[in-house]
Structure formats: C-alpha cells, structure tokens
Amino acid sequence: MRPGEESQLVPKEIENAADEPRVLCIVQDTTNCKSVNERITLNLPASTSVKQLYEDVSNKAGYVSSTFSLMWGNGASNTDMAALDPTPDRTLQEAGFEAGKKNFLHLTDKDGEQPQLTSDESGTADSSGLDDSSQEKFIGPLPREESVAGTSNYVSQNYSYSSLLSKSDTGYVGLVNQAMTCYLNSLLQTLFMTPEFRNALYKWEFEESEEDPVSSIPYQLQRLFVLLQTSKKRAIETTDVTRSFGWDSSEAWQQHDVQELCRVMFDALEQKWKQTEQADLINQLYQGKLKDYVKCLECGYESWRIDTFLDIPLVIRPYGSNTAFGSMEEALHAFIQPETLDGPNQYFCERCKRKCDARKGLKFLHFPYLLTLQLKRFDFDYTSMHRIKLNDRMTFPDELDMSPFIDMEDEKSPQTDSCTDSGAENEGSCHSDQMSNDFSTDDAVDEGICLETNSNIEKLNKSVAEKNSLYELFSVMVHSGSAAGGHYYACIKSFADGQWYSFNDQHVSRITQEDIKKTYGGATGNRGYYSSAFASSTNAYMLMYRLKNPARNAQFLEASEFPEHIKLLVQKEQEQEEQEKRQREIERNTCKLKLFCMHPVKQIMMESKLEVHKDKTMKEAVEIANKLMDLEGVIPLDCCRLVKYDEFHDYLERSYEDEEDRTMGYLLGGVKSSYMFDLLLETKRPDQVFQSYKPGEVMVKVYVVDLKTETVASPVSVRAYLSQTIIEFKQLISKSVDLPPDSMRVILERCYNDLRLLNVANKTLKAEGFFRSNKVFVESSDSLDHQLVFTDSHLWKLLDRHANTIKLYVSLPEHPRPTARSVGPKGGGDMNPQEDYCSRAKSVDAILEESTEKLKSLSLQQHQDGGNGDSSKSTEGSDFENIDSPLNEVDSSGSADNRELENRILPADPENNFQPEERSDSDVNNDRSTSSVDSDILSSSHSSDTLCNADGTPIPLANGLDSHSITSSRRSKANDGKKETWDTAEEDSGTDSEYDESGKSRGEAQYMYFKAEPHAGEGCLAEGSKCLLVNVDKRITLAAFKQQLESFVGVPSSQFKVFRVYASNQEFESVRLNETLSSFSDDNKITIRLGRALKKGEYRVKIFQLLVNEPEPCKFVLDAVFSKGMTVRQSKEELLPLLREQCGLDLSIDRFRLRKKTWKNPGTVFLDSHVYENESISSCWEVLLEALDETEKMKSMSQLSLFTKRWRPSELKLDPFKEVVLESNSVEELRDKICEISAIPLENLEFAKGRGTFPCDISVLEIHQDLDWNPKVSTLNAWPLYISDDGAVIFYRDKTEEVMELTDEQRNELVKKESSRLQKTGHRVTYSPRKEKALKIYLDGPTNKDSAQD
C-alpha cells in the first residue's frame, strides 16, 4: 500500500465512527449498598449490546455484573420501569434506547439481595495484584477523610468508627477506637500477634458455670482473638473487653500509658488464671530476673537481693544531661552501670561496722523469653514545671544480642554468698535518673520492676536455650503527640510471613523497614534542652523482642488445630456475625418513616415510627400500621388506609387507590435514609367512603363563623385546586358546610393575624396565595355587617379576638390575708390600702361558687358600639360566657346590677402613662429569688438557710454579682464631694408601678376580652388547690390582667403578685405591668401569691443578716420594700417591727447597721443619714443587716471599716473577727490599730489581705506560707492590697511566734479536718490541677467498681 493510500484510511474510520449514533445512559444506584448513591454516566454507541452495558456499569460501580438489575422505562415515567434483560443478544438501539437523548436507568437489587462488591468476590487476600512497593503505605495517625489504599469501600452502618466493613487486603482485622482507647488497641494487637500468648490463651477453657462471661477477662480476650483471626469484618469492637475490665463508658475517654496498661492487664490475668494451667504463663513468657547489689570498696563485702521484672525502663536522656543516648544499647549499658556511694552517701558496711565507700548497681541474671523495653520519653521539666516529652532520636536494632548485659560471673558463682538485704533503699543515692527510685517499692512497680525478696533464693535453671541471648524485634508501639496527649499505634512483624504491618486502630496496612526507622525519633536542626515541652512528634515508646530459639519459637494455631471449645466458639461467633449480616440486610431494605393517626375514639393525634420491608404490599403495611396504633378491635381493617401526609403543613398529599397490591418500595420511591413526607393512617366509619386525594390538590380547613352567637365552629376539611376561582371555591365550600354561596364571605388567614377577604370572584386560589395547607373562615348571614369595610366589621373584630385569645390556668392563694405594713418614705406618697377592703370582700370559695351559678344563668351579650374591641375564643362551637364579679358588687357604689368581667378599663390620667422598663422578666429574675413575697410572707426560695420560718417548697437561689456593684473607690468620691444621682426616674426600678404618686390606679384605655371560670383537674399545679381557667386576650397588659383577677383573689391587685410557671415547675415573677401577655401561650400556668406590689419609686429588697464568726456568715432574713428618697434610719425604723415579729430579732436601732451586699461580700456601710437616692440600686437589691456589740463607730463616709483576724502559728488556729475602723487609708494607721487590739509590738506585727470571698477561709496548714505577708506599701488602695471600700479581711500575726511542729499522724488528722471544714463552707482558695486518673482493672466486675477503687 502506498503512503498516500494509507493516510486516507484513518480519516475514513473516524468519519464512520462519527456517523454512528450514540446513546447517553444515566444510571442511578438505588441499592443503598454504598454510603453515597452514585450516578454513573455512560455515552455508548447505539450498537453496544445490552450485555455490554451491564459489563460497563459493573466496572464503573464496582459490582459483580450478575448480582444487580438495571431498570429502564423506555423514556416513560418511573412508575412504568421494568428490568432490562441482558440475555438476548440485542443492541441498545434494538432495545428501544433513543440516541441523542438522556436515557435514565436505575441500578437495583436482584432477587432481594444486595449487589456483590468486586472486592468481596476476590476474598481477603491480595486481590489488587500490586506488589508491596506499589501499595500505599501508612504509618502514623490516619486523617479522618483518608482511607488505606487497596481496601474496600463497603460501608458499615453498625460500627461508628469503621468506615469500611470488609476485611483489609492485608488479611488482618483492626480494632475500633472507642474514644481514647488507642493505647489498648496497640497492646491487644501485639498480644494477638504473639504466637505463644495467643496459643496459650486458646488452650484455656472457660467454664460458664463458675464465672459470668461478661466479667471474665480471659474469656473476652479469647473471643476477641477468635474474631481477629476468623472475622471478615474490617474492624472489631473492644467494648466487651473493656466491660470485663469493669470499665464504664467514661473510661473510654481517659488517656493512659500503654506500659501501665500492660502491667495492670498482666496482673489481672494472673489473678484470673490462678489454679489453672495458665497460672504461671505471664512469668514464663515475660518475667526476667536481676540482682540489686551494694559492694563495699574497702573489704569487698557484697549485699544483694534478687528482683523480678516484666519490662526494662530505659531513660532517653540522663538526668542533668543535655545529650540523649544515641541507641538503645547505650541506654542498656547505662541501666546496669554502677554508681559510687561516697561522701554523705557512704554505705554502712556490716563487716567493717562503719560507713565506707561502696558501689551500687544492677546486674541482669536472666532475660525473659519475650523481652519488653520501655523508652521513657516522658519527663518533668523543673524549670517550666511542666511534664514534657523527649523526642530525641534513639535507634534500636532489629536483632538484639543481650549476652553483653548478663553477669556471667554471677551465673557461675554460687548464689549463697551474703544474701542479706543491703538496706540501701534507705540510703541516699546520687545515681542517674533510672536508678533514683529503684529501691522504692511503689516506684519500682511503676517502672515495671516487681521486687521479690526471699531468704531462700532458688538457684537459676540454666538451659541451652537460655544461653542463647539473641532477640528478634517484632513489635514497636509508637506514641504520636506530646506529653499533654497523643495517639498510640503499633508496628508489628508477622511471624507467619515476616512482613511488617501498621495496626492503627481499625486501619491495618503494610509497611517496610524504612517506616520502622522513622520511629527512632529526632528532628533536624539544633534543638534546645526544653524545646520538646509541647512539641508533637512520632517515635517508638515500647518495644517487644522475642528470643530466637527454634526449639521454643511457636507458630500460630490454624483453624483446623483449634481446641474443641475454640471451634465451638468460632461457630458461635460466625453464626452471630451471619445473624448481624442478615439483620443489616433487612435494615437496608426497610422503609422507615413517621406514622400519624387521629384516634377514632380518643380524637387525639397519635405518632409512631413505621418500619416496613420494601417488598411488603400496601395492604400488608396497613395491617402493620393498624397494630402499631393499637386499633385492633377498635375499627375494622377495611376502614383504614395509608395516605401520603405532610405533618408540618397538616396536608394530605395523595391517596393510593387501587394500589393495595403494590410494594411499599415502589410506592415510596425506594428505601431512603429519610423521607420528605410522612404517612397518615386514615380511618372512616363503615357507612362512609374514603375521599380520593390527588397530587396537586390543596387542603383547606374551613371554620364557620356565627356572628349572632360570636362562635367559631370546629374546622371542616375541604380539598380544592389552585386553578379554581373564588366563585367555584365558594360553591365547593357550600356543599360541605351547607351555607348559601351568594351571601358567603370567605376570609383567608395567610399567617398569624393576617386576614384577607376574598371578594374577587374570578381570581384563582393560586393568585390569592393559597398553598398546600390553608385556613379559611366563612360567614353567611343576612346582617348589614358585610356592607361595612372589612377591618371595621364585626366579623373582623371577632376573628381578631379569636386569633389573640389564649387559655391560662391560674392557681389562687389559699387564704387572702390583710397585707402587712409597707416600708415607705415618711410623710407622703403612701397609697391608701383600704384596710377594710379584705374584710368586706367575699372569700375565694364564695366567689367561685357564686361565679359558677351565674355562668349557668347569664345570657350572652353583644357589644356593637364603635369602641367595642371585645372578642372571644370558642372551641368546638362553644363560646366564652361573660360573668360578673361578685366582688365588684360589694365594691361598687351601691349598685347590685350584674356587671360583666369584660370591662372597659377606665382610662388613667394622661400623665400616668407607663414608664418603659429596660429589664425583661428573665433578666429581673435571673439574679433574684424565684419566689419573691411581701414583707410579711417569707420567700420560700430561702427556706434552706433562712433564720425565720417559711412555707413553701424550697427553690435554689441563684446568686450572682450585682450588676450595679461599686467598682470605684467610695472614699475618693466622698473626698471629692461628688454625689451619685439617678439617671432617669424609672431606670433602675425593678418594676413598673401599678399606681401613680397620688395612689390612682393605672390602666389601659382599651377594651380587652377576659373570661374566667372555676377549673379542676389537668392544668392545676396542685391537687385540691383553687384554680381558674382563664381565657384572655393576650394583648391585655399585666396591670389590667391583675385588675380583672382582683375579685377572685379577694384583695386589690396591688396586694398580690403574678408568677409564671415553666415546664420544670420553676417560677418567675412577672413584674412589668405595662407589658402585655403576648409572651404567654395556650395552656401556660400562672400562680398568684399574696404580697404587696410595688409603687412608683419602690424597690423590693432582700435583707440578709451578717454573722461574721458563724460557719454560714450570710443568712436570708426577709423581703422588705424600700423607696427612693428614704433615709437609712427610716428604713431601719420600718425594719425593727418586722424583724421582731417575723424573725424574733429584738434589736435596738442604734445597735445594728445596714450595709451593701455584693455577692457574698459585705460592702459599704450605710450611715443613718444616707439617702438611698444617692446609692445606685437595682431591682435585685440585696442589703446586709449587721448586729453591733456597741454603738456605731462609723460616723463619716471618709472612714473605713475592716475585718481583722489573728493567726496564731504556735496553736495553728485563728481568732474570731474583730472590726477596725480607720480614719484614712494609711497602712501605718492600720498597723497601729491592730497593735492596740492585739498587744503585739509594732516591730513584730505582720499582716496580709485575705483572698477570695468573705470570710476568706483558708487552711491553717497553708495560711503561714501562702498569703502575701507584710506587703511593702504605705496606702491600702495600692497594689497588692487594693482596699478602697469597707468589708476587706486582714489577717495578722506575731512574726516571732514559731509554727507548731506536727507528727505525721497529727498532720494527716489535721489535713482531714481542714479539708472537711473547707468543703462544708465552700471556701477553698488553693488551686490544685486535675490529677490523672489511675488505670485500674476491676476483677469483681463493674458492680463493685467503687469498692475496688477504694
């Protein structure tokens, strides 16, 4: 062929390929086999066969082609889709696929089975075909978003920490990290990969009759190891193992040390294996022996003992050195390097009978079969006082020869030479860090060395295998992080194939020798000694070696070699795993959605969760729903059906007529994690016919309004189309409610209080703003009301009232009592309380009885005048009837005519408008008692610590810092002559006044709806209590609401208070009288308590008694009312009788003072001439009352009152408080005053300011050193004293007085006593950082955890 001809062939081929039509296939995966349903797009030639389409989809989706089906509907709707058959040899074009258009297909389950992933077909071995070099390697903590290469992407919904369910391609199974259990996972994987330990564990047989399997540690380890060896899962939970440790869920959030866990777990296993074949297993595998000796350098006498160890702790960096050991061998040599005891550390030689220089050290006598080495990377930095991690580089060999570290002379020499204890543990030591605590029993255990002293030490058995000291590295437990926290994982070499693997919680991957070298630690560049204080790094922390001895080295037991009890356990676990798999399969094919039903008898909407298999038919689903709603025997099954429902809009979307035999998966659009709709189990009477609901319809709730009776009937549901006109809609409504459409007025409520009259006949519902669910009011009367403008009509006012009326449950007080005196300014502004009011008023019982009778007899009355804004709310066709107030008859000017409670509240004087209040109810009550009462009724909120008797349930008082506390110096203000004034008339008032200065009642000139009737049962706060059911317009003010309640409470509105009750039965007082009830909602509960309401300028004040030398220095006494402009002396005069009557405190007016209370601290002393207007006060005002032993010393604002207390070190006790009054803020004057009251010479006096809140309690064991004694200042308002106001605490002492010396027993007793005292008072000022929780394994199970811990 010529070149020219050849060049023409390629364009010809391209041209033919372009001419062939192509089919665009979009495949949606609906199987729920993966966490995210994929969408696959394929653009194939039309000549592609259907079979090839299956293959292409299989490759794209990762499924085996024969395990799924493709649904296709030839371009029709989803409801007509059918399975695409791959067997006939047809092309896509022949099958009906259209070229140039989108062809949508659904990938679905085949025969009810989930598609099989291609990774599942190949098993758990290497199916990728990649060698180790091409595999993605991983070492270190895994990022959350990443996964290990070569693993399956099959999602497990059962294991929250396992992103994949199938086993890793390595063939090994990971462990799920519960929260912070990575240290546990690392050790468990290491033990599992130790053939000798795993095989021995398998040989142990659990006896269920002797022990509970839940608390058996060996059995749970055995189960875990069996699952790790046989399970096909990617990761296994460890919760059963930790539960056998006696741990609860909180233990999973505790970080611990892997070496500590190893020791504790081995101890627990030894305890559990007592009197079994495995009793000595830990010692046989992990225990070594060493000699601890001291040798006299003068006579050669040697004293020694034999110790056992389970692991060898090696320091990274010697104490006091800047250079770390470069290798593990160097650290081992340093471990056995002896130190010389000389100078003050000389050793007392038993032979020489005197102190001599000696050599002290350790010698290894026997190494264990499995050698454990701990690299002590955690240290304490005494400069920064922080725990640090040493990230220095330390190498370790793959094969370790331990023969240089064995003392061969000791092996050859007899062991009977001088076996006495050297007693060196009581001697001083200057050895390096790893030796500093070797002779302390507790510390030695922490280091992994178990001390064992025996006078008759057995001779060491030496075998040929033990002479061989060559060890092979097989596990590196790595810590990544800092001393503050981090992550553990393990690098383990498999003895089966010699390959290294990274076991990082649930992730297992292959690694190489180079990855092991990365765990040596170290960093590039120069690093200072303390540079690693908070550094995060990854390095080896614990190493495990196994002795290379072919005679002893074991191989893992294969499944065929398992003991019989293990085979049974494997079978049991496999059956359980299969059951879990079947259950997961069922879960994946179960449709779960909300189910609602209006109970046909109870007439309440019930809610449940419907779970139905996707292959169940609609008829079967109705049966399930019928049982779920407990309707069996209540209503026949043929009177029930399921319809598509939108609960949020209360909208029936569609019904499923003639589809009873369709599957639920088909009708619901497949199995989904969540649905955008719900189901409603609709019921009917046998004589009724179900209405058909079509998509596109809208639901309308029609309320019929009767203007004559002013009632709103219950709703009737009507379904309409958005395309209907208003005239058609009226005709549709007319058929349902039997009203003439010609005179019908239709009002649409589009949202709250948005009423729209639909009067354009040809306008469509869509144009009027109809949506899925709508609310419509209709009225058809012959009155002239429809001729008025809609907003002026009676219908609009009735609907407006209907929308704003709420139902409240009001609990009344038991017995109205005459109100106590008010504490007010002398000479003016007092309100006339009408003392004979209560005596003339009827009792609550009589009022309720009379009101009930009148409710039965009164006829409905209408108010048609222009100012009539009256409204009522009716439910189920009933109306709120108007009742008159019996108390009003008494109070009226002789009139006996019935008067409605729907009253026009008389307008107040124009100047008596309500003042704005900046604090809401929640703000007011956040820092005040939840149950504030009148001065003669004690607050129940202080019943736990009050000095007086009080009734009611205690409610905790939330104390907080006064937002108006004085932060600047009162003294400087007094000296500068400045005066504090009120910013605005009502700015700091705790409440709006219900009365003006002249005592006139303040009201609102608006007509509001109010109706009250006696109520018993649901809604009442206490059984047997008097309760009202009140229907009220929520636009009424609190003041008007209280006035309407006067007749029922039996006292004027100024003599009771309103408390709102929340879900937790916590009460908050509503005090803002000019606010409406708009924040209230239906069925809210209200409690009425007796107590005088505040007038303008008045403030409710909580009085506390200051008892400086009592354990509880601040006790609540009573509530009082102070007013602006009152002097302190006037308030004291008013308080005296109250204190005498209510609390039994008989005080003289000159023998007590009032002072400011700032949280728990006593503050400024109020002088008798002080006017409260000069003090910044708030609605949550608190004042301290302090009884005096003598007449008042404070005469001027320039004086300063301090509390002083003497510390006696020789007796370890504190004297009572004594008050010192200073004329200035001079330190010299303070020292002189203290000398006067203490008789301490001035040159020996030392003082310090107390810390914390009053009374500044501190332990007697700490006060002598912890306080800042004798500060070098000349004035009290300078640093570090900062004393500028009354109430500061000063401790003082005689510096020549010596501190009492205590024995250990006395000190321990005093520590307990002081700790108990300070805990009771709550005054603990010393700071103690949170201690690390000790790692413990509770052998008696979780029930005895507390006792075991103790």
UniProtKB/Swiss-Prot annotation:
Record GO cellular component, one term: cytosol
EC number assigned by the record: 3.4.19.12
The entry's keywords: Cytoplasm, DNA damage, DNA repair, Hydrolase, Protease, Thiol protease, Ubl conjugation pathway
GO molecular function, one term: cysteine-type deubiquitinase activity
Origin: domain of life: Eukaryota
Key word S-adenosyl-L-methionine present: no
Ranges where the USP domain occurs: 173-548
Compositional bias of kind Polar residues: 115-132, 415-437, 859-877
The reaction(s) this protein catalyses: Thiol-dependent hydrolysis of ester, thioester, amide, peptide and isopeptide bonds formed by the C-terminal Gly of ubiquitin (a 76-residue protein attached to proteins as an intracellular targeting signal)
Pfam families in UniProt: UCH, USP47_C
UniProt-annotated catalytic positions: 182, 487
Comp. bias (Low complexity): 929-945
GO BP: any one term: regulation of protein stability
InterPro entries registered for this protein in UniProt: Papain-like_cys_pep_sf (IPR038765), Peptidase_C19 (IPR050164), Peptidase_C19_UCH (IPR001394), Ubiquitin-like_domsf (IPR029071), USP47_C (IPR045578), USP_CS (IPR018200), USP_dom (IPR028889)
Bias-annotated ranges (Acidic residues): 983-996
Region (Disordered): 111-138, 409-437, 815-836, 859-1000
Function: Ubiquitin-specific protease that specifically deubiquitinates monoubiquitinated DNA polymerase beta (polb), stabilizing polb thereby playing a role in base-excision repair (BER).
PANTHER family reported in the protein's UniProt record: UBIQUITIN CARBOXYL-TERMINAL HYDROLASE, UBIQUITIN CARBOXYL-TERMINAL HYDROLASE 47
Family to which this protein belongs: Belongs to the peptidase C19 family. USP47 subfamily.
Protein name according to UniProt: Ubiquitin carboxyl-terminal hydrolase 47
Protein species of origin: Xenopus laevis (African clawed frog)
Lineage, highest ranks first: Eukaryota, Metazoa, Chordata, Craniata, Vertebrata
Gene: usp47
